Amino acid sequence: MKQDKMAEVQSHACNQKARVYLETYGCQMNFSDTEIISSILSDAGYAIAESEQVADIIFLNTCAVRENAEQRIRNRLQNLRPLKKQNPKLIVGVLGCMAERLREKLFQEEKIVDLIAGPDAYRTLPNLLDLAESGEKAANVMLSLEETYADINPLRKNGHSAFLAIMRGCDNMCAFCIVPYTRGRERSRPMTSILDELKQLSDEGTREVTLLGQNVNSYYDENSGTRFANLMDKASLVNPNMRIRFTTSHPKDISSELIDVIAERKNLCEFIHLPVQSGSSRMLELMNRGHTREDYLEKIALIKSKIPNCSISTDMISGFCTETEADHAATLSLLREVRYDYAFTFVYSVRPNTPAATRLNDDVPDDVKQRRLSEVIALQQKISAELYRNDIGNTHEVLIEGESKRSSDMWMGRARNNRVVVFPKNGAQVGDFVNVKITDATSATLIGNAL
């Protein structure tokens, strides 16, 4: 699509108040992006719809990190066909990483799609919508070296907790990962804009903020020379009673300075998500992770020595290229040694154009991948159950997030260490901090009573 043609189209959304329904898939960054998209569209005069049934426009904010993530989107597009048939003027758009990966090819493969926009193109959505409303296929998948959306005030629904993106993109080029190709190079927001947004959130009564980035540990504000540990230190001072979390970290970049800051500042939560992907140094080298098993364990030991009550989670890939039974055994032994609170576990799926896709052979049979994944999951569930049972008798400060999915008589919230806690309702409300004494546990949930 030519930029001059986009410029010629005058937005008429303010007059029409078209209704946009947004559906989000994938990581926390995508959910944060949806809040940015909502703000951009709202400022352009569009109304945000609560249901696809009443929408004039349906946007799917997508993930491309694994093949099954993209298949979910394709299935969803198929499900939308009856709505499109019922209302031919309905505009269906695919946003985010899947749009960036497939680009205009998506129009050919999914005829229902009228509009595509990559993660750095959301400011152009009003113009793209004007083109789509005129009957044209509209696309913008240009990546940017500067875009951080730092000046956009996200339209958030959740008043007690918030995502705040501090950087975008990734420069690590892990062999299996498509993120650098769908989200572009690393860019950090200015420190002042982050602190200003934290202050605004604090003034609005937000109780907990999660700082987001593909690799927050490589955050760097060129103007002030601020790195992530210093940013976290300054962020903790905005409101000492507002919890602050962060995700995601790359093991090679997490610093002793950051660990010291978390240990010192009482409102920085004792929880670190530290994806390792494999327990085998041979696999880590093939994956281009930039560290060995021993390097990783040194970081884990440092965290546990400085923050003894810190919970740690991870990501694991089973069946990466050439993985042997010995490599798999090394992953299982790492689980036993680290004792993660939980792990996000996946079988390896080839992502087109990644280094692994072009240079390595996906030679582990599917049944072997699945068997190894099952063994990883079974061991991790056993470890999680042991850790959670050890919490019985302890008391946690819990931020109430909402009703338990299993019972309307129970509240569900999170402890500082990110463990999910459920307890019978009392006089407290969503957004309140409550001290809860733990009386029981499963492998994924703590159960207790409010004090």
Swiss-Prot record:
Q: Which CDD domains match?
A: Radical_SAM
Primary location recorded for the protein, binned into one broad class = cytoplasm
Q: Which UniProt keywords apply?
A: 4Fe-4S, Cytoplasm, Iron, Iron-sulfur, Metal-binding, S-adenosyl-L-methionine, Transferase, tRNA processing
Q: Which residues cross the membrane?
A: none
One Pfam match, given by its short name, reads: TRAM
Residue positions binding [4Fe-4S] cluster 2:
170, 174, 177
Is Iron included in the keywords of this UniProt record?
yes
Gene3D superfamilies named in the record: Methylthiotransferase, N-terminal domain, Nucleic acid-binding proteins, tm_1862 like domain
Per its record, the protein catalyses: N(6)-dimethylallyladenosine(37) in tRNA + (sulfur carrier)-SH + AH2 + 2 S-adenosyl-L-methionine = 2-methylsulfanyl-N(6)-dimethylallyladenosine(37) in tRNA + (sulfur carrier)-H + 5'-deoxyadenosine + L-methionine + A + S-adenosyl-L-homocysteine + 2 H(+)
Protein residues bound to [4Fe-4S] cluster 1: 27, 63, 97
Q: Where does the record place the MTTase N-terminal domain?
A: 18-134
Entry's cofactor comment = Binds 2 [4Fe-4S] clusters. One cluster is coordinated with 3 cysteines and an exchangeable S-adenosyl-L-methionine.
Location of this chain's protein in the cell? Cytoplasm
Q: Name one GO cellular component term.
A: cytosol
What EC number(s) has UniProt assigned to this enzyme?
Answer: 2.8.4.3
Q: Give an example GO molecular function.
A: N6-isopentenyladenosine methylthiotransferase activity
**InterPro entries, sorted:** Elp3/MiaA/NifB-like_rSAM (IPR006638), Methylthiotransferase (IPR005839), Methylthiotransferase_CS (IPR020612), Methylthiotransferase_N (IPR013848), Methylthiotransferase_N_sf (IPR038135), MiaB_methiolase (IPR006463), NA-bd_OB-fold (IPR012340), rSAM (IPR007197)
Which cofactors does the annotated protein need, by name? [4Fe-4S] cluster
Enumerate the HAMAP family for this protein. tRNA_metthiotr_MiaB
Q: What does this protein do?
A: Catalyzes the methylthiolation of N6-(dimethylallyl)adenosine (i(6)A), leading to the formation of 2-methylthio-N6-(dimethylallyl)adenosine (ms(2)i(6)A) at position 37 in tRNAs that read codons beginning with uridine.
User: What family does the database annotate?
Assistant: Belongs to the methylthiotransferase family. MiaB subfamily.
Report quaternary structure and partners. Answer: Monomer.
Designated name of the protein: tRNA-2-methylthio-N(6)-dimethylallyladenosine synthase
Its gene name is: miaB
